Amino acid sequence: MPDLDRIVKDIAEEMRARPDRGAVASYIPELARADPQAFGLVVIDGDGRVAAGGDADIAFSIQSISKVFTLTLALGMVGDRLWRRVGREPSGSPFNSIVQLERENGIPRNPFINAGAIAVTDVILSGHQPREALGEILRFMQFLAQDDSIAIDDRVAASEKRTGFRNAALANYMRSFDVIENPVDYTLGVYFHHCAIAMTCRQLATAGLFLAYSGHHPLAGHSVISAERARRINAIMLTCGHYDGSGDFAYRVGLPGKSGVGGGILAVAPGRASICVWSPGLDAAGNSHLGRIALEMLVKRTGWSIFGV
């Protein structure tokens, strides 16, 4: 990766010096403990070459980034039948909004807003006990990251459960339309726990490689999903991956990506690399403030936007 090491390290240094860092998520108490000065960036290509800068090996709560992987699992289980229970359109609303559910008969707008991810989690749960479903999700993450040490932060999961009243409202509302088929408490329990998986930038970038290489994970040595499915997941990441900031992210960065309120962003440069950036301070839409700026810098300096140089 010519010059990429220098590019990544330069960006990390520039981000360290910026005073405008956004606000750390406070509605989940455990997330409020994150260090607002933290910043990490990792880029991994298909040969396993790594460019890393900043806090690349500090674990953080991946939160909604897990939704990329639960979507992948659910599609593997039920295929396109999933789209009977969740849509594929941008929401234009906050990630935990209930307004669209009321207007659209309990069908979530896409799998990356909270309601959609809860519905996807319910698909994975069907036919399993909650512990089994959660174990399947965790093992999938460990496999993709090529690291069996990845675990759930139980303190974050418990914190989410204690304060997850809006998510409970979303799940119960969907249950009234039979979009949720399992006991709501079971589905929410699995959802809270997979959002509480803790990973580093290096681990997440490794996990996302299959999306950068047409469904093939070059480090694992075989295909995870078909090229067509990888392309479609990337499309949903581009249009829906940053809640009501998705259009701005596509405009500024031009890569498929998925954010989480833990401050992480997983981004995909198709055919080139998988990227993870982490900075806990968020913008008004709940996306990493410096993370988006760093990715915009990276794309400008590498020419990796899917829309051209």
UniProtKB/Swiss-Prot annotation:
Q: Which residues cross the membrane?
A: none
| The keyword Hydrolase appears for this protein | yes
Q: Which residues bind substrate?
A: S64, N114, E160, N167, Y191, Y243, V261
InterPro entries hit by this protein: Beta-lactam/transpept-like, Glutaminase
Q: Does the keyword Iron apply?
A: no
Q: Name one GO biological process term.
A: glutamine catabolic process
Q: What is its EC number?
A: 3.5.1.2
Kindly report, in one word, the top-level EC class recorded for this enzyme. Answer: hydrolase
**What UniProt keywords are attached to this protein's entry?**
Hydrolase
Catalytic activity from the UniProt record = L-glutamine + H2O = L-glutamate + NH4(+)
Listed SUPFAM superfamilies: beta-lactamase/transpeptidase-like
* GO MF terms, alphabetically ordered: glutaminase activity
HAMAP family in UniProt? Glutaminase
PANTHER family registered for this protein in UniProt: GLUTAMINASE
Q: Which family does it belong to?
A: Belongs to the glutaminase family.
Relate the assembly described in the record. Homotetramer.
Question: In its UniProt entry, what is this protein called?
Answer: Glutaminase
Q: What is the lineage of its organism?
A: Bacteria, Pseudomonadati, Pseudomonadota, Alphaproteobacteria, Hyphomicrobiales
